[in-house]
């Protein structure tokens, strides 16, 4: 696929023009001032990532994509992993965050750095710089904080921030800890401005109030107008935010969501979302995206747009090798090429996870089968048939497969060699109905 290295190759006159076309900017400071900053000499910009979980998610991915666009244009990125703010957590729309132990937060911070470093360039003239706000916040006394930082914030302005206002009007209210978050984030921007002449902050649209805290602070104490812009919040089909606190997170860490499942998330997006997702989540040129969108309208059954989207985003996050392995595993699973025996155990477990059944305790598990068990019994256990007689009829009609091999004998039993990686046997009914049993 034709990747681009900057906005000109993508078919745009300026970087800001490209970001706006891709729908990557929700709100910003004065557009002319922002355009002048982005189109001039390289600037230093930053985005903050709080380690409130062990992984980033696709809501954060939008920020990383924006950072990557700016990095490709020659600007200098700073990734702030919030060692201090991560101990507090920014206020949510509802409910206080659980405070995590310091050692847990520190471990999560290291994991986030590794994820970010896998996406942004870590070498070269504009390599990403990692900083932690714990380094300049932890040593600050309460008196210093109140005198040097807090003195510059007006309570009326702080109370008017959207999230704060909502929380104040709710039953649970808001703690002083979370209320103070915007002051800490504002101080972060000031520190990075002083230390690295950082003049632009990026964030999600739900962070607008926190971003403008730094904007106002720098204007007040340094007399300089800096810039901020936010990206839109990604939502699911019901309009709910995709995020780690919403229970349906699409994680970027391969140990928390496998590349296979990550790929499946993108390839299963509906046609109506193709234009916005291809624009926002890929680096394909404008002309190629427009072609794919048109193709999805005229030939939706081909699903070229979905396949391209899934490949582009998964390879961006997990690399091409892991993405190809996920595609090969999917093809092998349905007998569309590839060899089931070539899939490693970790990938197998991930691929087959959706074929678990609910046991008597309400747990999702793989049904158990052993060498010597009949295939028809294993197929029933996997939920493919309601009775042995139904399974027998399907075998007679040639519609039952064990590891993609048609079953001819109604009394065939599972052999040791039928368990892939020594654990899983895949049973298929027809072309699409799949089940799996585990030897344990």
From Swiss-Prot:
Quaternary state and interactors: Homodimer.
NCBIfam families linked to this entry: tyrS
Subcellular locations according to the entry: Cytoplasm
Name this polypeptide is given: Tyrosine--tRNA ligase
InterPro entries: aa-tRNA-synth_I_CS, aa-tRNA-synth_Ic, Rossmann-like_a/b/a_fold, S4_RNA-bd_sf, SYY-like_C, Tyr-tRNA-ligase, Tyr-tRNA-ligase_bac-type, Tyr-tRNA-ligase_bac_1
Motif 'HIGH' region mapped to chain: 51-60
UniProt superkingdom: Bacteria
GO cellular component: cytosol
Intervals of motif 'KMSKS' region: 241-245
Gene3D superfamilies registered for this protein in UniProt: HUPs, RNA-binding S4 domain, Tyrosyl-Transfer RNA Synthetase
Swiss-Prot/TrEMBL catalytic activity: tRNA(Tyr) + L-tyrosine + ATP = L-tyrosyl-tRNA(Tyr) + AMP + diphosphate + H(+)
């Amino acid at each position: 696929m034709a990747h681009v290295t900057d906005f000109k190759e993508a078919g745009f006159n300026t970087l800001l023009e490209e970001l706006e076309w891709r729908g990557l900017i929700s709100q910003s400071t004065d557009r002319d001032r922002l355009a002048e900053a982005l189109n001039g000499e390289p600037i230093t910009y930053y985005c903050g990532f709080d380690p409130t979980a062990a992984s980033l998610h696709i809501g954060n991915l939008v920020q990383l994509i924006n950072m990557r666009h700016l990095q490709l244009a020659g600007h200098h990125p700073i990734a702030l992993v919030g060692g201090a703010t991560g101990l507090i957590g920014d206020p949510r729309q509802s409910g206080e965050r659980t405070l995590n132990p310091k050692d847990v937060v520190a471990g999560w911070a290291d994991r986030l750095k590794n994820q970010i470093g896998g996406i942004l360039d870590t070498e070269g003239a504009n390599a990403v710089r990692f900083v932690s706000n714990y380094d300049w916040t932890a040593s600050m006394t309460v008196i210093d904080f109140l005198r040097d930082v807090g003195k510059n914030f007006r309570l009326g302005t702080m109370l008017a921030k959207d999230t704060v206002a909502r929380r104040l009007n709710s039953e649970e209210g808001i703690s002083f800890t979370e209320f103070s978050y915007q002051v800490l984030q504002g101080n972060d921007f000031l520190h990075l401005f002083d230390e690295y002449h950082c003049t632009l902050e990026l964030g999600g649209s739900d962070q607008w109030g926190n971003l403008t805290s730094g904007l106002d602070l720098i204007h007040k104490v340094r007399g300089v107008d800096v810039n901020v812009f936010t990206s839109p919040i990604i939502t699911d089909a019901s309009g709910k935010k995709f995020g780690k606190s919403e229970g349906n997170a699409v994680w970027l860490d391969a140990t928390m969501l496998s590349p296979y499942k990550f790929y499946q998330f993108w390839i299963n997006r509906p046609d109506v979302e193709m234009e916005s997702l291809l624009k926002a989540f890929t680096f394909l040129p404008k002309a190629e995206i427009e072609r794919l969108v048109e193709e999805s309208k005229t030939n939706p059954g081909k699903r070229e747009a979905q396949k391209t989207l899934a490949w582009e985003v998964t390879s961006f996050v997990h690399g091409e090798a892991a993405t190809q392995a996920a595609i090969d595993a999917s093809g092998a699973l349905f007998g569309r090429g590839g060899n089931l025996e070539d899939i490693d155990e970790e990938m197998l477990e991930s691929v087959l996870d959706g074929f678990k059944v609910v046991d008597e305790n309400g747990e999702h598990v793989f049904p158990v089968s052993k060498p010597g068990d009949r295939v028809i019994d294993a197929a029933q256990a996997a939920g493919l048939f309601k009775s042995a007689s139904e399974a027998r009829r399907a075998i007679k009609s040639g519609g039952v497969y064990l590891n993609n091999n048609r079953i001819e004998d109604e009394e065939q039993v599972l052999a040791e060699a039928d368990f892939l990686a020594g654990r899983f046997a895949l049973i298929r009914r027809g072309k699409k109905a799949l089940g799996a049993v585990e030897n344990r």
